[in-house]
């Protein structure tokens, strides 16, 4: 029987097959698409693996009579002889049954039922004589034919895929003991924790698909399902909705629209199939793992338990896994997988740490000015045009190129002589993504305009000032403020705590007397007109006259102007409310001080961001403007997202394609190998040893200053800069380290040594070793040629950016 292609997540992939599956369609359908992973979909299915292992335990023979566990298969008589053998039946076709010990002594013949039909074949006898010798005589082999199975060829073939029932706890232990890709498993555990259980995850995905279907379906109905000519002709005085609906409007849609709707239907079908596979083979097994091994019986507890507690319980299971156990196989020289809080965060954040470093080291230059559209420059952040659309394209092009299918850094990227070839290939990826974005741009723009309209209209109707007065952090700020090894839920919590103090800091700066006075006048006039129209509508309303439909101007009724002036009044009132509240606070009995510098310092307690260029300038409007680029108005962020749908192809083609060489150089220079962990970002290891910093920054130091002009002060300054994740000296790495210890309660939990590190003496590595780390002392530098990961594409972009990040 051919092997099933839906392999387990713990089986290693074939490199050649993965390279062949790297097709154009696999790139189009995007991350985790069913097309991209159907041939190598990674499941947690211990039952099928146990069945195969039981067959191999019987000796691995495909011959039916060679299995000692099948004691009731046939009756053997040693009196007959023949050279013929029964047809060979593969072990995969044997039905799994519990083993029953024989009732007679081993080697004797069990009694033959009188009414049982006998089918005989000549085959060599393998019986055991009374003296213990193996009989080599040829015997007449008799096969007992069951009543339900008509023929010999189907006698021992299972009717369906046989599964061995495994108790829940043993199933979870089997899952944990047979992990091969630890990065993926830990990411699945964290995804389950952040998703708050299997039902919340599944329902969230269903809601996302339903939202996508509704937006496309409702837009199609409004475009081709309503007869607007009949409504505008006014030939009939009374019309209902049923009179305006066009029956079978899909058949009358343009051919291009039908093609797009057909592709959309296929995409939704694939997403549903993928959701089923994830629920059946991944989420269910992860839920069982949480319940049986992590002692979390209900998913509701995931909302109250901390991630640090889960990490602590996970570390207690390390001796049950052959990859992480250090108490067994003491003579095994193979590296063991490291498992503590720092290593778990490094595995989950392996890819994101590189993006954080790329942005904080200013390797990615995303500044983009539009000479012909200079009016948009105040709206766009010209220093860094990073939106969700561009961020998704960056991950698409970089992740699937730099990292392989196992989540490790591709060894080819770490070789100097491959630099030019890899830079050209990465540049080609950026240009291909630009072309695809340009082709899909018209459809994506329409989709996102409708999506934002449907989403924010209700919020605008309830609170019109919310879209103008509210602020949020931009995508560029999120990557700029994020620490190394900081998991998303820690980062979201930190940003949410900073929003209140950030608004307080911005509101302390004066808005300008001219703007405030004009807004006060507009608010008064709009409120007065709205009040008069509402009172007149209530006074003149009767059965014969309707003031709401009275046309104040041509084709514009009183209700229309009430909506317009009411909106203006609400927006201006919301903008003036901040100044009023600040004045009331100043006049209240409690002391209130206008101190922007102290307010910004309080904000930095949550953001951990205060560059050296802000020193002694915290009270200035210049610093306030730079901070507003990070903490921008919500309406500006939405406009940037819509404009980026058009600008992303040009940024990918002209900006990022020319920086592909710098990206390759950065990954090669700032990747360090850690024994038991693999290649990780240098800054994520929190290694503050001088020798490592000098080694990692050697090339940059040579470019900055020649050795003949170096002084001791220069060495100290450059050493301080090398500690940072950014060149402006804001101590990115040390802040990440301190916050990491704070997030995991204490130092012992975060950097708990493994049993191996407690037993072995601490030995110093040779100076300049790239593997030297505070958390690991015996590194073995080795290079593993792992299969290159599959590529993904941008077609999934139609539903990637409309949903907020989980938990935000």
UniProtKB/Swiss-Prot annotation:
GO cellular component annotations of the record: autophagosome; cytoplasmic vesicle membrane; endoplasmic reticulum membrane; Golgi membrane; phagophore assembly site membrane
Organism of origin: Meyerozyma guilliermondii (strain ATCC 6260 / CBS 566 / DSM 6381 / JCM 1539 / NBRC 10279 / NRRL Y-324) (Yeast)
Compositionally skewed regions (Basic residues) per UniProt: 700-711
Gene giving rise to this polypeptide: ATG9
Lumenal topological intervals: 227-258, 539-557
Disordered: annotated span: 51-116, 698-732, 748-771
Comment field on protein domains: Forms a homotrimer with a solvated central pore, which is connected laterally to the cytosol through the cavity within each protomer. Acts as a lipid scramblase that uses its central pore to function: the central pore opens laterally to accommodate lipid headgroups, thereby enabling lipid flipping and redistribution of lipids added to the outer leaflet of ATG9-containing vesicles, thereby enabling growth into autophagosomes.
Single Gene Ontology BP annotation: piecemeal microautophagy of the nucleus
Ranges annotated as spanning the membrane: 206-226, 259-279, 518-538, 558-578
Superkingdom of origin organism: Eukaryota
Post-translational modification: Phosphorylated by ATG1. ATG1 phosphorylation is required for preautophagosome elongation.
Membrane topology, record value: Multi-pass membrane protein
UniProt subcellular location: Preautophagosomal structure membrane; Cytoplasmic vesicle membrane; Golgi apparatus membrane; Endoplasmic reticulum membrane
Keywords: Autophagy, Cytoplasmic vesicle, Endoplasmic reticulum, Golgi apparatus, Lipid transport, Membrane, Phosphoprotein, Transmembrane, Transmembrane helix, Transport
Family statement drawn from the similarity comment of this UniProt entry: Belongs to the ATG9 family.
Compositionally skewed regions (Low complexity) per UniProt: 72-89
Catalytic activity: a 1,2-diacyl-sn-glycero-3-phosphocholine(in) = a 1,2-diacyl-sn-glycero-3-phosphocholine(out); a 1,2-diacyl-sn-glycero-3-phospho-L-serine(in) = a 1,2-diacyl-sn-glycero-3-phospho-L-serine(out); a 1,2-diacyl-sn-glycero-3-phosphoethanolamine(in) = a 1,2-diacyl-sn-glycero-3-phosphoethanolamine(out); a 1,2-diacyl-sn-glycero-3-phospho-(1D-myo-inositol-3-phosphate)(in) = a 1,2-diacyl-sn-glycero-3-phospho-(1D-myo-inositol-3-phosphate)(out)
Residue ranges annotated as Cytoplasmic topological domain: 1-205, 280-433, 455-517, 579-633, 655-808
Main localization category: membrane
Protein name per UniProt: Autophagy-related protein 9
């Amino acid at each position: 029987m051919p092997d099933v292609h839906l392999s387990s997540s713990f089986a290693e992939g074939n490199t050649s097959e993965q390279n062949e599956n790297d097709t154009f369609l696999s790139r189009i359908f995007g991350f985790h698409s069913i097309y991209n992973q159907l041939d190598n979909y990674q499941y947690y299915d211990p039952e099928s693996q146990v069945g195969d292992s039981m067959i191999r335990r019987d000796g691995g023979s495909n011959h039916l009579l060679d299995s000692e566990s099948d004691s009731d298969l046939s009756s053997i008589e040693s009196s007959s002889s023949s050279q013929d053998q029964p047809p060979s039946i593969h072990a995969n076709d044997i039905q799994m049954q519990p083993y029953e010990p024989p009732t007679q002594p081993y080697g004797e013949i069990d009694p033959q039922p009188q009414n049982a039909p006998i089918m005989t074949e000549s085959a060599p006898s393998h019986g055991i004589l009374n003296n213990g010798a193996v009989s080599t005589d040829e015997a007449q082999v008799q096969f007992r034919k069951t009543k339900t199975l008509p023929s010999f060829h189907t006698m021992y073939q299972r009717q369906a895929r046989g599964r061995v029932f495994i108790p829940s706890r043993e199933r979870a232990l089997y899952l944990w003991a047979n992990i091969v890709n630890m990065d993926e498993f830990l990411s699945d555990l964290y995804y389950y924790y952040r998703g708050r259980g299997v039902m919340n995850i599944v329902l969230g995905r269903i809601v996302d698909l339903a939202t996508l279907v509704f937006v496309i379906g409702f837009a199609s109905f409004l475009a081709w399902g309503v007869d607007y000519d009949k409504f505008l002709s006014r030939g009939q005085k009374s019309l209902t909705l049923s009179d305006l609906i066009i029956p079978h409007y899909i058949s009358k849609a343009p051919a291009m629209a039908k093609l797009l709707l057909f592709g959309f239907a296929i995409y939704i079908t694939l997403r549903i199939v993928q959701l089923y596979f994830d629920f059946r083979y991944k989420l269910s097994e992860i839920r069982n793992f949480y319940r049986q091994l992590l002692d979390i019986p209900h998913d509701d507890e995931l909302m109250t338990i901390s991630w640090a507690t889960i990490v602590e319980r996970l570390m207690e299971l390390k001796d049950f896994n052959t990859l992480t156990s250090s108490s067994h196989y003491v003579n095994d020289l193979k590296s063991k997988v490291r498992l503590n809080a720092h290593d778990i965060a490094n595995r989950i954040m392996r890819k994101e740490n590189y993006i954080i470093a790329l942005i904080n080291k200013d390797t990615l230059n995303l500044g983009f000015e539009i000479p012909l559209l200079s009016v948009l420059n105040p709206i766009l952040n010209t220093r860094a045009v990073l939106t969700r659309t561009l961020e998704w394209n960056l991950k698409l092009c970089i992740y699937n190129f730099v990292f392989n299918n196992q989540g490790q850094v591709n060894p080819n990227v770490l070789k100097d002589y491959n630099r030019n070839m890899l830079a050209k290939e990465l540049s080609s990826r950026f240009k291909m993504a630009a072309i695809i974005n340009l082709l899909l741009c018209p459809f994506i723009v329409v989709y996102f305009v409708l999506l934002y309209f449907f989403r924010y209209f209700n919020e605008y109707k309830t609170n019109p000032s919310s879209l103008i007065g509210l602020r949020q952090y931009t995508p560029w700020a999120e990557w700029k403020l994020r620490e190394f090894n900081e998991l998303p839920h820690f980062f979201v919590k930190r940003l949410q705590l900073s929003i209140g103090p950030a608004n307080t800091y911005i509101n302390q700066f004066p808005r300008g007397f001219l703007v405030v006075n004009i807004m006060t006048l507009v608010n008064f006039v709009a409120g007065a007109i709205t009040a008069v129209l509402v009172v007149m509508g209530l006074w003149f309303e009767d059965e014969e006259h309707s003031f709401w439909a009275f046309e104040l101007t041509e084709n514009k009724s009183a209700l229309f102007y009430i909506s317009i002036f009411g909106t203006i009044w609400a927006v201006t009132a919301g903008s003036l409310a901040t100044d009023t509240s600040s004045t009331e606070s100043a006049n209240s009995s409690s002391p209130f001080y206008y101190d922007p510098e102290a307010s910004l310092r309080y904000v930095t307690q949550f953001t951990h961001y205060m560059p050296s260029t802000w020193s002694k300038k915290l009270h200035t409007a210049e610093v306030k403007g730079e901070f507003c680029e990070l903490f921008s108005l919500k309406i500006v962020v939405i406009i940037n997202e819509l404009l980026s749908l058009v600008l992303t192809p040009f940024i990918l083609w002209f900006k990022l394609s020319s920086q592909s060489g710098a990206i390759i150089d950065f990954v090669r220079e700032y990747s360090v190998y850690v024994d038991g962990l693999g290649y990780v970002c240098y800054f994520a290891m929190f290694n503050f040893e001088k020798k490592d910093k000098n080694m990692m920054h050697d090339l940059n130091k040579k470019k900055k200053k020649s050795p003949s002009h170096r002084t001791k002060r220069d060495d100290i300054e450059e050493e301080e800069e090398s500690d940072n994740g950014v060149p402006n000296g804001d101590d990115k790495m040390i802040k990440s380290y301190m916050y990491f210890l704070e997030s995991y309660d204490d130092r012992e939990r975060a950097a708990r040594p493994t049993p191996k590190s407690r037993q072995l003496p601490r030995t110093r590595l040779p100076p300049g070793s790239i593997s030297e780390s505070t958390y690991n002392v015996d590194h073995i530098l080795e290079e593993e040629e792992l299969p290159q990961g599959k590529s993904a594409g941008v077609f999934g972009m139609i539903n990637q950016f409309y949903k907020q990040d989980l938990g935000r």
